[in-house]
């Protein structure tokens, strides 16, 4: 099975890693698309850790803009949707794997639905209050075809 995994920041990759590792052990083809903070000098170019872990980065999509945070996330989401559309068209995955409640997950859910790809959403049930992440997470869960919550074991 061909899997596209979108990750934009070290904190989500840390959670995705064991899932990706198990998928790799099961001989699935994993295509990682790195975006956002992974590609930033300010955040220590954490995409290099993905490579060090033995995963192939199929595409890098630069979405960080030097504007205020609200404008940056909104415009960056637009850039991510455009770039991810090209990646999905070229790679033709069986499904798209995303985690959480950031712009990466909503972008992947939108692209996956418009391009008739299954969307698997991890960690959709973890509430965060006081910012846009909560409604984004709920929207991604609605758009996802498979929804996985984490359990203690």
Q: Which residues make up each language-model segment?
A:
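Conserved nucleotide-sugar phosphate-binding/catalytic loop shared by glycosyltransferases and other
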Residues: 29-73, 83
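An aromatic- and histidine-rich active-site surface loop
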Residues: 97-114
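Structural motif
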Residues: 6, 33, 98-100, 122-123
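Helix N-cap/beta->alpha junction signal
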Residues: 9, 101-102, 150-153
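Short N-terminal targeting/anchoring amphipathic segment
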Residues: 86-102
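Active-site-proximal region of nucleotide-activated glycan assembly enzymes
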Residues: 117-153
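N-terminal subdomain of nucleotide-sugar transferases
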Residues: 1-38
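Hydrophobic/aromatic ligand-binding patch that stacks against planar heteroaromatic rings
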Residues: 22, 108-112, 139-140
């Amino acid at each position: 099975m061909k899997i596209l995994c979108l990750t934009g920041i070290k904190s989500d990759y840390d959670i995705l890693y064991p899932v990706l590792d198990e998928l790799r052990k099961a001989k699935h083809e994993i295509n990682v698309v790195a975006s956002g903070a992974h590609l930033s000098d300010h955040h220590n170019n954490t995409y290099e850790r993905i490579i060090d872990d033995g995963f192939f980065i199929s595409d890098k999509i630069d979405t960080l803009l030097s504007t205020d945070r609200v404008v940056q996330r909104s415009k960056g989401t637009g850039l991510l949707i455009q770039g991810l559309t090209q990646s999905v068209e070229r790679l033709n995955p069986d499904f798209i794997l995303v985690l959480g409640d950031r712009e990466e997950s909503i972008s992947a859910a939108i692209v996956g639905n418009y391009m008739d790809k299954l969307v698997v959403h991890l960690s959709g049930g973890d509430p965060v209050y006081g910012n846009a992440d909560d409604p984004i997470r709920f929207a991604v869960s609605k758009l996802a075809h498979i929804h996985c919550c984490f359990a203690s074991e």
